[in-house]
């Protein structure tokens, strides 16, 4: 779809959406997302120019259908896929991608850490109409025996290779600084971000500052040539409730704000990653803190989980926090699956995580009164009251599961037009009872109106 749009920009030094927006240009991508979001194109341009909205759209990813991430857009969700050093299967990752597309993930991140990482990423990019993100440090590690052996040159080389391949956004852990490492020492769970832990290990081994930080402007130069969006990683995010909102987390967040503004000087798009594990009552404060420190750059949060006691159900514990975070301004939610803290998610875990987060994002859109956000809810409610079962299935977030649950107890096709379900049966269905009451009330009103109109209507013909 984007091939012709991209061709016009060939040879330009900066092809980022922010660069064009600041030049007063409404790109085709901006016009596309404006129509998609029911926004004016000029508003989209202004939000991208300001840095409050991003459109991750690498010029090497022509298969992409652009979308907007920001406070003025609908809340988006990301799904993570990718193999591990223990399991590596391209077909399985593509199957996961298809599940992501089927159930409505807005973006996908390839977090592969084993096998032929570039080959897996290439397959995902060429099959994905949604933005694809990565964490470059994972591939960097595949080239060395020990994290201490990483060099800034290798890291920049991998980043450039991924950008040239078409990656739309990258998690760069540039805010984990040497001075911040001791701040995490008192924590119950320490540093739980893989990227954050790896960079801390590198800094301690090399007695040097984080190379993502020291070479940040060189990364900006790469990103603006391809229009890669920064997803500034929260390497010091809290990994349990007890560690939430501590000095380490907010020291890094302040550094991420400084880096955000540095990237904007280069005309590069930025979103900022956030926690993690946060008690429910602290979530609004965390959202406000990000807006304040990061100049309103879009906030991309992992959950947050609001309790630590439910392994196997963390798609639920985190979706609760995600809904609150989105209501208070988070622009994108990174899903959590039932396998979180337990193992690599399979296809069923991916589906359950996406559905949980679609619910959270949608609930927040309704709460924030997004234009048209409640249309689907109202349509499904009307179908429910009319006992239009097939319409209810069609409008649901997960039609297959809705239909299967209904058919467990009422499997015959005749029950698709029944005015009851197996919960209440025909005798106790409240909606059916109310329907009869409404009909009776309407008939009574009609009769009363008829009686009232008789004197004004002239002679009454008696039977």
Swiss-Prot record:
Binds 1 [4Fe-4S] cluster per subunit. The cluster is coordinated with 3 cysteines and an exchangeable S-adenosyl-L-methionine. Substrate binds at residues 80, 109, 138, 173, 193-195, 234-237, 273, 300. Pathway: Cofactor biosynthesis; thiamine diphosphate biosynthesis. InterPro entries: ThiC (IPR037509), ThiC/Bza_core_dom (IPR038521), ThiC/BzaA/B (IPR002817). It holds the Pfam family ThiC_Rad_SAM. Its EC number is 4.1.99.17. The keyword Zinc applies. [4Fe-4S] cluster binds at residues 421, 424, 429. It comes from the Bacteria. Its cofactor is [4Fe-4S] cluster. Keywords: 4Fe-4S, Iron, Iron-sulfur, Lyase, Metal-binding, S-adenosyl-L-methionine, Thiamine biosynthesis, Zinc. Zn(2+) binds at residues 277, 341. Catalyzes the synthesis of the hydroxymethylpyrimidine phosphate (HMP-P) moiety of thiamine from aminoimidazole ribotide (AIR) in a radical S-adenosyl-L-methionine (SAM)-dependent reaction. This is Phosphomethylpyrimidine synthase. It comes from Anaeromyxobacter dehalogenans (strain 2CP-1 / ATCC BAA-258). The lineage of its organism: Bacteria, Pseudomonadati, Myxococcota, Myxococcia, Myxococcales. The gene is thiC.
């Amino acid at each position: 779809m984007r091939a012709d749009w991209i061709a016009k920009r060939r040879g330009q030094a900066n092809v980022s959406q922010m660069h064009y927006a600041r030049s007063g240009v409404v790109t085709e991508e901006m016009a596309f997302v404006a129509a998609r979001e029911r926004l004016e194109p000029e508003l989209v341009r202004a939000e991208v120019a300001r840095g409050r909205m991003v459109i991750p759209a690498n010029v090497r990813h022509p298969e992409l259908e652009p979308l907007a991430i920001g406070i003025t857009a609908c809340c988006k969700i990301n799904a993570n896929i990718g193999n591990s050093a223990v399991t590596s299967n391209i077909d399985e990752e593509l199957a996961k991608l298809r599940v992501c597309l089927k159930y409505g993930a807005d973006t996908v991140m390839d977090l592969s850490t084993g096998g032929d990482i570039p080959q897996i990423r290439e397959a995902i990019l060429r099959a994905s109409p949604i933005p694809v993100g990565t964490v470059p440090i994972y591939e960097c590690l595949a080239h060395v025996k020990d994290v201490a052996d990483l060099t800034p040159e290798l890291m920049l080389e991998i980043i450039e290779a991924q950008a040239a391949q078409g990656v739309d956004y990258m998690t760069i852990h540039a805010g984990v600084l040497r001075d911040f490492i001791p701040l995490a020492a008192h924590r119950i769970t320490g540093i739980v971000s893989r990227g954050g832990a790896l960079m801390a290990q590198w800094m301690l081994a090399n007695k040097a500052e984080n190379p993502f930080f020291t070479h940040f402007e060189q990364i900006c130069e790469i990103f603006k040539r391809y229009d890669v969006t920064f997803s500034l990683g929260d390497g010091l995010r809290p990994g349990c409730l007890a560690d939430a909102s501590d000095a380490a987390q907010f020291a890094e967040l302040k550094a991420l704000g400084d880096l955000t503004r540095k990237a904007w000087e280069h005309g590069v798009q930025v979103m900022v990653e956030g926690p993690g594990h946060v008690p429910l009552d602290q979530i609004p404060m965390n959202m406000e803190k990000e807006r304040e420190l990061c100049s309103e750059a879009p906030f991309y949060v992992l959950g947050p989980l609001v309790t630590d006691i439910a392994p196997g159900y963390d798609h639920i514990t985190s979706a609760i926090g995600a809904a609150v975070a989105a209501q208070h301004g988070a622009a994108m939610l990174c899903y959590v699956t039932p396998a979180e803290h337990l193992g690599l998610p399979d296809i069923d875990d991916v589906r359950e995580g996406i559905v949980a987060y679609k619910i959270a994002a949608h609930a927040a859109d309704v709460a924030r009164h997004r234009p048209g956000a409640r249309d689907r809810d109202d349509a499904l409610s009307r179908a429910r009251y009319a006992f239009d079962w097939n319409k209810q299935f069609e409008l649901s977030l997960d039609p297959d599961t809705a239909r299967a649950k209904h058919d467990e107890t009422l499997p015959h096709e005749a029950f698709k037009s029944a005015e009851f379900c197996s919960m209440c049966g025909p005798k106790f269905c409240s909606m059916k009872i109310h329907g009869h009451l409404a009909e009776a009330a309407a008939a009574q009103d009609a009769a009363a109106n008829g009686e009232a109109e008789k004197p004004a209507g002239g002679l009454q013909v008696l039977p």
